């Protein structure tokens, strides 16, 4: 009979423990998602800014070096290349950069998990 008297106390204990465990798990999962998201965003932003800066420098260098070339060369290039070439190349390069960044992020997190 004394064993049956402890069942309501055990149920109340479990009912108090379950929300705490769920809250702890949700907080832990939120921290992991936030950390990974922030790391990925920072890496993507840094790499895209470096790539855009280098493309800008390359474009400036080419435009200054090709100052003596006539407009016929530009007309030739516009007639050879399709309409959406620059957009297509930009999307492909951005996708490759995003895949590279997520690969780097996974490697960094793997190293961090081995250390910790």
UniProtKB/Swiss-Prot annotation:
Gene Ontology CC terms, in alphabetical order: host cell membrane; membrane; virion component
Protein name: Head virion protein G6P
Family in the record: Belongs to the inovirus G6P protein family.
Keywords for the protein's UniProt record, in alphabetical order: Host membrane, Membrane, Transmembrane, Transmembrane helix, Viral penetration into host cytoplasm, Viral penetration into host cytoplasm via pilus retraction, Virion, Virus entry into host cell
Chief location category: virion
Self-association state and partner proteins as the record states: Interacts with G3P; this interaction is required for proper integration of G3P and G6P into the virion.
Function: Plays essential roles both in the entry of the viral genome into the bacterial host and in budding process. The formation of the G3P-G6P complex termed adsorption complex is essential for correct termination of filamentous phage assembly.
Annotated signal sequence range: none
Membrane topology annotation: Multi-pass membrane protein
Gene assigned in the entry: VI
Subcellular location: Virion; Host membrane
Segments passing through the bilayer: 13-33, 38-58, 84-104
Gene Ontology BP annotations: symbiont entry into host cell
